[in-house]
C-alpha cells in the first residue's frame, strides 16, 4: 500500500479536481474525516496484538477479504444517519476511503512488478520504499 503521505497527497490532488460543487463543499467542511478516510484501514497495521501475530490483522482482512461487501456495508451505514452533519461527515470519510482503495488498486500491480510478491526483509523494504 502506498504510505500515509502518498495517500494524503493523492487525496489533495483528487479533491482539487472535483467539479461537483456540492461534493467539493462537503469534503471541505469535513476535511478531517476525508483525510482519515484517505488512510483506509492502514492505521490498523499498527495495532500491536495483530502486528505480533496474536490476532488476525483487521487491515489485512479489509484489504483482501470481501472488499466489495465491506464497501457495500460502509455505504449502506450512511442511510441510518439522521442528522445532516453526520451524513456529510460520513460521506467525506467514505470519499476518502474510496480514494485510498483506488490508489492501492493502481499502485500494487506496479509495486509487485518491481519487487515481486514474496515477503522477505529485503523485498518488504523495497516495497515500502516504492510506495512512499
What is the predicted function of each stretch?
Residues 1-92, 110-132:
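N-terminal, motif-rich segments that launch catalysis or mediate targeting to/interaction with membranes
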Residues 44, 99, 103:
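Short active-site segment of divalent metal-dependent hydrolases/proteases
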Residues 104-108:
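Alpha-helical transmembrane segments and their lipid-water interface positions
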Residues 91-99:
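Short alpha-helix carrying the canonical HExxH Zn2+-binding catalytic motif
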Amino acid at each position: 500500500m502506498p504510505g500515509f503521505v502518498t495517500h494524503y497527497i493523492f487525496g489533495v490532488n483528487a479533491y482539487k479536481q472535483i467539479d461537483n460543487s456540492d461534493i467539493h463543499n462537503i469534503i471541505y467542511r469535513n476535511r478531517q474525516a476525508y483525510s482519515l478516510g484517505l488512510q483506509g484501514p492502514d492505521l490498523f497495521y499498527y495495532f500491536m496484538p495483530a502486528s505480533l501475530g496474536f490476532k488476525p490483522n483487521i487491515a489485512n482482512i479489509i484489504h483482501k477479504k470481501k472488499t466489495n461487501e465491506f464497501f457495500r456495508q460502509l455505504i449502506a451505514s450512511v442511510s441510518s444517519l439522521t442528522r445532516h452533519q453526520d451524513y456529510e461527515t460520513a460521506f467525506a470519510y467514505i470519499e476518502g476511503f474510496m480514494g485510498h482503495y483506488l490508489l492501492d488498486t493502481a499502485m500494487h500491480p506496479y509495486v509487485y512488478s518491481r519487487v515481486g510478491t514474496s515477503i522477505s526483509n529485503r523485498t518488504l523494504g523495497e516495497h515500502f520504499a516504492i510506495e512512499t
